[in-house]
Amino acid sequence: MTDRVSAGNLRVARVLYDFVNNEALPGTDINPNSFWSGVAKVVADLTPQNQSLLNSRDELQAQIDKWHRHRVIEPFDVDAYRQFLIDIGYLLPEPDDFTISTSGVDDEITMTAGPQLVVPVLNARFALNAANARWGSLYDALYGTDTIPETEGAEKGSEYNKIRGDKVIAYARKFMDQAVPLASDSWTNATGVSIFDGQLQIAIGTNSTGLASPEKFVGYNRQLRSSNWSVLLANHGLHIEVLIDPESPIGKTDPVGIKDVILESAITTIMDFEDSVTAVDADDKVRGYRNWLGLNKGDLTEEVNKDGKTFTRVLNADRSYTTPDGGELTLPGRSLLFVRNVGHLTTSDAILVDGGDGQEKEVFEGIIDAVFTGLAAIHGLKTGEANGPLTNSRTGSIYIVKPKMHGPAEVAFTCELFSRVEDVLGLPQGTLKVGIMDEERRTTLNLKACIKAAADRVVFINTGFLDRTGDEIHTSMEAGPMIRKGAMKNSTWIKAYEDANVDIGLAAGFKGKAQIGKGMWAMTELMADMVEQKIGQPKAGATTAWVPSPTAATLHAMHYHQVDVAAVQQELTGQRRATVDQLLTIPLAKKLAWAPEEIREEVDNDCQSILGYVVRWVDQGIGCSKVPDIHNVALMEDRATLRISSQLLANWLRHGVITSEDVRASLERMAPLVDQQNAEDPAYRPMAPNFDDSIAFLAAQELILSGAQQPNGYTEPILHRRRREFKAQNR
């Protein structure tokens, strides 16, 4: 039984109440009684609106389901379909042209194109690593990944391999020729670096040259009479620090003495309370809020064991340099932090209220998140004894990503919520900025109206093709069987979706004012493929794109040196490449599209993916991790990938492509494989052979068999209930 404290008409879990009063409020000048009174008023006023929006989702889905059921044997008529969506208020009139007016936004969002990390906030070590990933070693990123092939004697091995190291150095030199080329010759032939009369000089044997663009030399860091120093370069708004130490093990092998090339990497990071975490009760929520508070205060620490040694990981300080003219330059040492709240659907037992029928009910989790992540973020706006030594925003803003919104009314509700939270926290109106995830079909189709609803708060739009695919399937669940999961990336609607997001953002004035983002690279070990393919995102006009790790951030950062995103956006501005009809193209399969073995392959792939993710979610409370697929390729899985897999199988089940017996048989085939893949984890609980005794196995099965009935295909209701069930059985 959760211990609770009464705060007005709120019944607050004591763990949350004590955290707020003893840790979060001190240093904010907010009176505790006034705070809790304000929270109660926000909950009372906005809960009915939140519920009404969810009711609208269900009503629209029911009408769409009915429309498809009545036309299932007819050829698809896009004109009739479009008019139907207009008639029911799903597809809204596009507003007149406008320009966003958000103010007080940090340069990392408005001026700098670069990678964006997403990390589960409940894991302090991951959170610290991500916040510190503003700067990363290119040498380490190349040496430790498959970006450099393990051929021709270049294996990683257990000790330093000079052959591999030389390939790393050669790769880095080639990159520098692209980002900061010399006026003549190549960095590959450089034999020395010096500064003369405020200019960078690069020796090439007995000759010397400078940079092709001398203004790209912006600073250096050197102690008197020391051979250990660094040169700071800049390109497309991103910095490159060349570390020179001829006495270091790597520097000794280099003609210039370069021991590393440090890239400005994760410019921004999203600390996630949503798809990558398991937060099903008050204890979980407070653990996340406490980490978020520590990040904003700058005092979050974590004991780390590595190579038999223990050390304390802390947040990095800012970095100082001398400018070419002898002045001072300070650059941020940490990524600028966003926080992702949950969407409008879920509720939390962290706070209960009277439901009006004598029964207590949980408060909407999105309301709670806005209040408490906003409160903690106040400490990131100032320094002091009660606020910690570091700040996050330098412009007085708090950045909140809001996911899974369906249409402009839901965006407007978020803005009203943020305004009310600002009043409770005593913050100026407009302090809480919003990042809009374009990951639900109704938002995609009405994106311009969604942006207009937040025109004075919006700081980013981002395509999340994983969730967006899940909603694409669920919205048209009754239309017929969908194409296979792997074929979705080549479907008509996806290209239109990605193009429309950029075009509409640019038309609304995002260039130089807000981020336009693109989705995650999920194959965490396949960095060579990422380096080859992910450059397509900045080439498409995105100022940021998601990466799964600090290493991936450093490698992806190279793309923003190779592509001038500002120039790309300038070229794209004024275009409208996607049509509504393309966005309305449902990814339906043709009749008799697959052989039996292809169907079995898809079902086994999806069942294995679902089990591999859900077993860690339910049994261990891990919301985001590398999950080996059926071919043992590590994939970064979160609830978005789970939504796709479960919805596709639910769709095939609904239309008779497979049966419930097929699903059960596949789950039973795949569970032993997942058990084997997790055999080295001492905390792992096998699902086989007693499948019905495994809550995780039953959760995976339920996600598929009940997938068509889940609200918008979301997995949270089943996952949360099953995780709570597991925790109750294992107290």
Swiss-Prot record:
Pfam family, one: MSG_insertion
Catalytic residues, chain numbering: R340 (proton acceptor), D638 (proton donor)
InterPro entries membership: Malate_synth_C_sf, Malate_synth_sf, Malate_synthase_TIM, Malate_synthG, MS_C, MS_N, MS_N_TIM-barrel_dom, MSG_insertion
SUPFAM superfamilies (UniProt xref): Malate synthase G
Recorded superkingdom: Bacteria
Sites bearing Cysteine sulfenic acid (-SOH), chain numbering: C624
Primary site of residence: cytoplasm
EC nos: 2.3.3.9
List of residues binding acetyl-CoA: V118, R125, F126, S276, R313, P548
Top enzyme class: transferase
GO cellular component, one term: cytosol
Pathway terms, separated by semicolons: Carbohydrate metabolism; glyoxylate cycle; (S)-malate from isocitrate: step 2/2
Keywords, comma-separated and alphabetical: Cytoplasm, Glyoxylate bypass, Magnesium, Metal-binding, Oxidation, Transferase, Tricarboxylic acid cycle
Annotated catalysed reactions: glyoxylate + acetyl-CoA + H2O = (S)-malate + CoA + H(+)
Protein residues bound to Mg(2+): E439, D467
Subcellular location: Cytoplasm
Names of required cofactors: Mg(2+)
UniProt GO MF annotations: magnesium ion binding; malate synthase activity
UniProt binding sites for glyoxylate: R340, E439, G464, F465, L466, D467
UniProt record, GO biological process: glyoxylate catabolic process; glyoxylate cycle; tricarboxylic acid cycle
Oligomeric form and interacting partners: Monomer.
Summary of the function given for this chain in its UniProt record: Involved in the glycolate utilization. Catalyzes the condensation and subsequent hydrolysis of acetyl-coenzyme A (acetyl-CoA) and glyoxylate to form malate and CoA.
Family matches, as PANTHER family: MALATE SYNTHASE G
Protein name: Malate synthase G
